[in-house]
Every structure is written in structure tokens, then in C-alpha cells.
Regions:
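Extended active-site neighborhood of metal-dependent phosphoesterases/phosphodiesterases
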Residues: 101, 106, 115-131, 192-279, ...
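An acidic-aromatic substrate-binding cleft motif
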Residues: 100, 125-181, 187
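Active-site-proximal segments of metal-dependent phosphoesterases and phosphodiesterases across multiple
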Residues: 156, 264, 270, 285-324, ...
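Acidic, histidine-bearing metal-coordination/catalytic regions of metal-dependent phosphoesterases
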Residues: 18-150, 394-422
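Loop/turn elements at helix/coil->beta-strand transitions in domains of secreted/extracellular proteins
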Residues: 138-141, 173-178, 203-209, 245, ...
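Active-site neighborhood of phospho(di)ester-bond hydrolases with catalytic His/Asp-centered motifs
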Residues: 144-146, 177-183, 187, 208-214, ...
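Core catalytic region of metal-dependent phosphoesterases/phosphodiesterases
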Residues: 158-220, 318
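Acidic/histidine-rich helix-loop elements
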Residues: 62-98, 142-162, 231-238, 266-270, ...
Length: 422
């Protein structure tokens, strides 16, 4: 009798868990693999009673799925977020009840420059199709966005960020993918924030890549872990040490993107380890463009004081980094091409750009152009606390063009990064 009772209690507990998680599958997202010309990673979660652990995929023109292929995911029980203090959409404090099966699948052998659809499920039950596009086109474009701090009690934050992506889509209806520069959640330890965010349409339509922001790394009560962003995604496992799946690199076409985690670079030892890895990646992976991404700003937008620029500029000069992207400061800052601390004609040097916030809530106000580093900084932009902006990035063999757009699609700033490598 006791055994029967214990079994019933266990079944009830699992059923209650399944009821508290979203309907399976959840937190579905397409992520880059190391070479996005022929390989894409898919990440999702299912409750412990679900068998939706496969992904099927085919070219977007094959709407009947007649030529679909299927991949069984690698799975494990994920408890990363379970029991962490959080907030309900109604603003009530509770502990995340998030024990689920994490699924990761790599779709390989893909055709370059091709639109694909994919869905999650098993047997005859499959989710609605989602989309991604492989790289390989001579010309491509992306939406760059940052700092919308998803927080379910204040859904207008994500609404503003997603509306900004729609604005970029209107500016360029053929964008290929989305890159974020961190702080896309208020607390990365709140799995409910990730699952709600990834239900939004832009996560259905594009491959997403991104870096770990300080908010993505934290919990409501100031816990810290890089596992939060790692387990909400499936990034390439080509980083270093404990940063596998958090720090990573990938190709989109002939551009090499290198993704860093500022939270492990606060001390000199962590910075040295990250820089040794970046040097190795650049030396072993040739590309027309080298683009390094991190969350913390290169310069402080309100006064122009150097932040991360001084820690990285010598290495970027040495390695020939073309573009350095960041977020965090909530103020747009863009420099001239810089080499050896001085502006150049663009034939050498790195352009440093940090994105504005996009949640219509957490922007900053500045009165004048920065008083420091005026010889380096070429543009700043803000809308005060209610700032919303994003960047359209266009690439071809001759140059990268970055265009800052406001929420209405107006061009606020534009810069060109010349190709310096064949």
C-alpha cells in the first residue's frame, strides 16, 4: 500500500510539473553551429513526460515535408533553473519549478544560402514550423539588437524589442539572422523569462546568436552562473575551459564572429585567458571579416571615458579585428576606425560600436557629445530613459555597412567598415 501511495505521489508531482511548464516543446531556438553555411544547432525543452525529442527539417519550399529529414536530439535532465527565486507575470514572488528535458540537435549537411523550415515532435505530432537561413550568399544582412531585459511582469519591454526587430524587417525585408549583445533577460536564472521570450515571432523566424550579459548571468537574489544562457541555447562547443557553450565562434558567410563572456573577464587572469583564446581562434580561422562581440561597452556614452576599449585595443590591432560590438551602456556609441589609439582612413583599424537599449525603459540621457576621447568617437545617440534602437548590418565582399535605426525606421547614423583581407 505504501509503495502504491508513493508511486501516486510521484506521478502527481510529475504531472504538476508538466502543468507549470509551457506546453512541450518550449524555449525553441535556432542557433549557429561553427559554420552556418552547412550546419545549424536547434535547442529546446520538453517536460519529463514528453517524447518530442526529435527535430525534422526540410527546405522551405517543401511545405508538405516530403523530403524532410529527422534528427534525434541529445537529451539530459536540466535542473539549472529549478528552485530559483523569480516572479510570476502577475509580479508575485515564487521559485521556478523547472526540471525538464533539455534537447540539442545539430542539423548538418545543409545547403548554403538556403531557407529551411523545422519543427519539433515525434510520430505524427509536430510543432508549427519555424525558420532559419544558412549563410553562403555573396551579400547578407542581420538585425543587431541589445538590452531589452525580458521580464514577464513588464511585458512592454519585450514588446518594444520585438517591435524594433519588426522595424528593421521593414527597412530590409530580407534580413538573414539576428545577433544580440546581451541582457535580453532581466534575470537569466528565471527560466520562465526565457520560455516566454522565445515564444515571440522573431525567434520563430530566424537563427539567433548572442553573448552573455550581466543580467543573463544573474538571478533575482544575485546568484551568478553562465549556465543560464548556455542551457537556454545550443551554441557551438568550441570555447575554452568552463566557457564551452557560452564563449564560442562561428562563421556567417565569410565573417568570423567571436563571442565573449565579460563575467569571467573581470580580473586580469580571466582577461588573459580570454585573450589567449581569441588569439588562437583568429590565427587558426581565416576570414574576410573578424568581428568580436561582448556585452560591456567599449566607452561610456555619457562622458566618452574608456571602458573595455583599453583592455582590448592592442590585441585587436595585432589580430586585425575589423569590428567590435557591445551593448550594456544603453547609449549608442560609434568610433572611427582606430589603430594604435588613433583614427585612420579605414584601411586599417577596428571600428568600435555599442548598441543602444531597446526596451523603452532603461535608456540613459546625455547632454553633450562625450568630453573624453573626442578624437576617437564619431557618433552617440540616445532618447533618454525611453530609448529604442537597433542596427541593420549589411555585408558584401567590399565592406560592412552598419545603420542605426530608431523605432520609426529613421536612419540615425551609418558607418562603413572596409574589407582589409581577401
Amino acid at each position: 500500500m505504501k509503495r502504491i501511495f508513493s508511486t501516486l505521489v510521484a506521478i502527481f508531482a510529475i504531472s504538476s510539473l508538466a502543468a507549470q511548464l509551457p506546453a512541450s516543446p518550449f524555449t525553441v531556438v535556432a542557433c549557429p553551429d561553427q559554420d552556418t553555411r552547412n550546419s545549424i544547432n536547434i535547442s529546446w525543452g520538453v517536460d519529463t513526460l514528453s517524447d518530442a525529442t526529435s527535430v525534422r527539417y526540410t527546405r522551405a519550399s517543401d511545405t508538405a515535408w516530403k523530403r524532410a529529414r529527422m534528427v534525434e536530439a541529445a537529451t539530459h535532465l536540466c535542473t539549472t533553473y529549478d528552485g530559483i527565486s523569480s516572479k510570476t507575470p502577475q509580479g508575485k514572488t515564487y521559485n521556478e519549478d523547472a526540471r525538464f528535458i533539455k534537447c540539442e540537435a545539430t542539423l548538418s549537411g545543409l545547403r548554403p544560402n538556403t531557407d529551411y523550415i523545422y519543427s519539433i515532435g515525434s510520430g505524427d505530432k509536430w510543432s508549427e514550423p519555424r525558420h532559419f537561413r544558412t549563410s553562403g550568399a555573396k551579400e547578407w544582412s542581420a538585425c543587431l539588437i541589445s538590452d531589452f531585459h525580458a521580464y514577464t511582469p513588464l511585458p512592454h519591454r519585450v514588446d518594444a524589442g520585438m517591435a524594433m526587430i519588426s522595424t528593421v524587417e521593414k527597412y530590409d525585408p530580407s534580413i538573414d539572422w539576428v545577433l544580440h549583445l546581451g541582457d535580453i533577460t532581466a534575470w537569466g536564472g528565471s527560466y520562465s523569462f526565457w520560455s516566454d521570450l522565445y515564444s515571440r515571432k522573431p525567434f520563430h523566424d530566424y537563427m539567433w546568436a548572442g553573448v552573455n550579459g550581466n543580467h543573463d548571468n544573474m538571478t533575482r537574489v544575485n546568484g551568478q552562473s553562465n549556465a543560464f544562457i548556455r542551457d537556454a541555447n545550443f551554441y557551438p562547443r568550441n570555447g575554452y575551459g568552463d566557457e564551452m557553450g557560452v564563449c564560442y565562434y562561428f562563421y556567417y558567410g565569410d565573417a568570423l564572429f567571436i563571442m565573449l563572456n565579460n563575467e569571467v573577464m573581470r580580473k586580469d587572469e580571466g582577461l588573459a585567458e580570454a585573450q589567449a583564446w581569441v588569439r588562437k581562434v583568429v590565427e587558426q580561422n581565416k576570414a574576410r571579416y573578424v568581428i568580436v562581440c561582448e556585452h560591456y561597452q567599449w566607452f561610456f556614452g555619457h562622458d566618452g571615458k574608456s571602458s573595455q576599449y583599453g583592455r582590448w585595443c592592442e590585441l585587436f590591432d595585432e589580430l586585425g579585428v575589423d569590428l567590435a560590438l557591445a551593448g550594456n551602456n544603453h547609449i549608442y556609441v560609434r568610433t572611427a576606425p582606430l589603430y594604435a589609439g588613433e583614427a585612420t582612413d579605414g584601411k586599417r583599424g577596428t571600428v568600435y560600436v555599442q548598441l543602444p537599449s531597446s526596451d523603452n525603459e532603461r535608456g540613459q540621457a546625455i547632454k553633450d557629445m562625450p568630453k573624453q576621447n573626442e578624437d576617437k568617437i564619431r557618433a552617440t545617440w540616445y532618447e533618454g530613459p525611453q530609448t529604442v534602437g537597433a542596427i541593420h548590418l549589411a555585408a558584401d565582399k567590399k565592406h560592412l555597412v552598419l545603420t542605426l535605426l530608431d523605432r520609426n525606421g529613421n536612419e540615425i547614423d551609418k558607418c562603413e567598415v572596409l574589407a582589409k583581407k581577401k
